[in-house]
Design a protein with these regions (language model features):
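Compact, glycine-rich, soluble single-domain proteins
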Residues: 24-142
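Bacterial N-terminal signal peptides that target proteins for export
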Residues: 2-10
Length: 142
């Protein structure tokens, strides 16, 4: 089994476990982006799939645990019925890139990737990252 297939299998298994366990409500934490505090869900392999929207939180945070190659890990919108914006940050919190992800209710759905290695990804409402610049940083405290 190739490394890419192993990663996909692990993501699928984690997603199935999340769905079966019904881990709702999702854990919530606060991070800072630029000078703004954000209340975020802690992301899972399912991301926003099956959720009606962000509700009372600002977004969803994904921690890869270390900087990862964007060619190996991408984000998709399958079964998400609304558009989402995403920002990727490296291990020091520096902005790597942003993208707008279109809603996709049925495959095939595009895969969105950062422009460079990243540790953190934050999904937010459309327009959430439109004013971000290279000086804006993500701060995640343990």
């Amino acid at each position: 089994m190739t490394a890419r297939l192993r990663v996909r299998a692990l993501v699928l298994a984690a997603g199935l476990a999340f769905g079966i366990a019904g881990c709702s409500p999702l854990p919530v934490r606060t991070v800072t982006i630029g000078d703004q505090p954000w209340t975020v869900y802690e992301g899972s392999a399912n991301g926003m799939r099956g959720l009606p929207g962000f509700g009372d939180v600002d977004g969803m945070l994904f921690d890869m645990g270390r900087n990862v190659d964007p060619a190996a890990v991408g984000f998709g919108m399958e079964d998400v019925g609304y558009p989402i914006d995403i920002a990727w940050f490296d291990g020091s919190g520096a902005l790597v890139s942003t993208a707008s992800m279109a809603a996709c209710e049925a495959p095939p759905c595009p895969v969105y990737r950062a422009d460079g290695p990243y540790r953190w990804a934050v999904e937010g409402r459309v327009g959430a990252f439109s004013d971000m610049g290279p000086e804006d940083r993500l701060v995640v405290e343990d």
